[in-house]
Amino acid sequence: MLELKALLLTQGMHGMVSQVEGLARALGLTFKHRSIKLKPLWNLLPPKLTPISENLVKEKFDCDSKVIISCGRKSVIPSIALKKRLGKEIFTIHIQDPKVSLKHFDLIISPEHDNIKGDNVLTTKGAIHYLTKKEIKDNLNYLNVNKEKKKLVAFIIGGPNKYYNYNDQTIHQLFTKIKTLFTPDKYKIIIV
């Protein structure tokens, strides 16, 4: 049986990596991941103002894959440049709004809140991820924490990025607010 390979392009942030890897796994693809870093000037410009060239990437890489799955602003131009060079030899998928013409990609998978529409756009309710039904089924008891029948409140907190970085004081303030708003006698709090 032919095994399709995918090249995954992201900026290396966990939220993006989990989406591209989740899609690759769901499609049954073997994959390799490249964290994209653009050269200094091009790093500052939005994709719609950036020329389409593989020369904008700090580190060159080969593409021996039939599928490219990209996610994030910095992966847009390398994905389009590879499609331009390889044409129909590859199938390009971009996750999230690429902020450029949708025609540059074979498929775009975008959450509803990005509010983009097109013949090649598949809309999701939220971010895609790498969890499978089997993993969820195998771990059903993992969060069996509500024996007291309290209201469950879950907080899914992302990691640091260019807009926000956590320090000990911020984490302490956040947890204090959560504990104040959702008292332990009435709520069971899950923080991920």
Describe the residue ranges of each PLM region.
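A nucleotide-sugar donor-handling region in carbohydrate enzymes
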Residues: 103-167
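Alpha-helix C-terminal capping segments
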Residues: 24-27, 61, 143-146, 181-182
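Glycine-rich beta-strand-to-loop/alpha-helix junction loops that act as flexible
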Residues: 71, 157-160, 192
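Active-site and donor-binding regions of nucleotide-sugar-utilizing enzymes
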Residues: 8-129
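Glycine-rich phosphate-binding "P-loop"
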Residues: 36-47, 155-169
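Extreme N-terminal starter segment of soluble prokaryotic enzymes
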Residues: 2-7
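Donor-nucleotide binding loops and adjacent catalytic segments primarily
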Residues: 149-150, 163-192
